[in-house]
Regions:
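Active-site neighborhood of HAD-like aspartate-dependent phosphohydrolases
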Residues: 1-57
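C-terminal cap/substrate-recognition subdomain and adjoining C-terminal extension
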Residues: 2-6, 83, 90-257
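Short N-terminal micro-motifs specific to bacterial/archaeal maturation
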Residues: 14-17, 32, 72, 159, ...
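Short, surface-exposed helix-loop/turn micro-motifs enriched in polar/charged residues
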Residues: 18, 61, 117-118
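Conserved active-site and cofactor/substrate-binding residues in soluble primary-metabolism enzymes
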Residues: 21, 76, 163
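Acidic/polar active-site rim loop that often engages polyanionic ligands
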Residues: 23, 46, 64-66, 148-153
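Low-complexity, charge- and small-residue-enriched intrinsically disordered regions
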Residues: 51-67, 245-257
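Metal-dependent phosphoesterase signature
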Residues: 62-99
Length: 257
């Protein structure tokens, strides 16, 4: 008897599942622990910034980011980086999670649907995030390890852009996933190939180009950035109103007599 194809939800990580760059948080943790210099981290930040501001696929910039990321790990023991990844998750990643995205992911889990992360982030870190959140698994960029030490090379390509769609299709073949009935969530126009690979694409905190594309294609859009901004504005205002209400209460008047 043939198994019924699975419906799965795929989530990008940076700015979709969490605010900011997971790789940047890991590199920050490594810098704070003396693994490399300010120059090392600044080179990565500049390469990442140029890529994010470019708005277009630039293979040279992607190669620079790939090279910078590989250099972070070269010569370090995998076990040490794994331990540090746990600390970085607790210090930086967990507080940066978008709770709205977590709720969406948990809703899929509640309906017995697998949840997979699909990210350019190193797979070791992506696996850790997925495990801590109770997700099914993760697809990420694979860093080569020999004799327990990172070599500074990648196995395969950076999991970025069209490569995400390719990886998801391969996973679907391996696990009997029904992509036409599955979901994908991302913030970036670079992930449009991933979103187009499933029957239910969704934009979360979309960049300008993805928002335009999503509106044109009538894809649902979730924007948790606005909700967070409103909470920041509303909290002090609400505090002032509560204080004012206390001052104007009859009990306050009686105390003032």
């Amino acid at each position: 008897m043939a198994l019924t194809p699975k419906r799965v939800a795929f989530f990008d990580v940076d700015n979709t599942l969490m605010r900011g760059s997971s790789l940047f948080f890991l590199s920050k943790g490594m810098y704070q622990r003396g693994f490399f210099t300010k120059k090392d981290i600044s080179n990565f930040v500049m390469a990442n910034l140029r890529y994010r501001l470019s708005g277009v696929e630039n293979k040279e910039e992607i190669a620079k980011i790939q090279g910078a990321a590989c250099e972070f790990f070269r010569g370090h023991e995998a076990a040490v980086i794994e331990k540090m990844g746990i600390e970085v998750y607790d210090e930086y990643v967990s507080p940066a999670l978008w709770q709205g995205t977590i709720e969406i992911a948990n809703n899929h889990l509640d309906h017995d649907e697998e949840v997979w992360l699909v990210t350019a982030t190193p797979k070791d870190l992506a696996d850790l995030i997925a495990k801590r959140l109770g997700f099914t698994g993760a697809l990420g960029t694979v860093a080569e390890v020999k004799d327990g030490v990172y070599t500074g090379k990648l196995i395969g390509q950076l999991l970025h852009g069209p490569n995400k769609a390719i990886a998801v299709k391969l996973l679907a073949e391996e696990r009997g996933i029904d992509l036409a009935n599955s979901y994908a969530y991302s913030d970036s126009h670079h992930d449009i190939p991933l979103l187009q690979a499933v029957g239910n694409p969704r934009a979360i905190n979309p960049d300008t180009l993805l928002q335009i594309h999503a509106l044109r294609e009538h894809w649902p859009i979730h924007d948790f950035r606005r909700m967070r901004a409103l909470k920041k504005i509303a909290a002090p205002v609400l505090g002032r109103l509560v204080k004012l209400g206390t001052l104007l209460s009859p009990r306050s008047w009686r105390r003032g007599r």
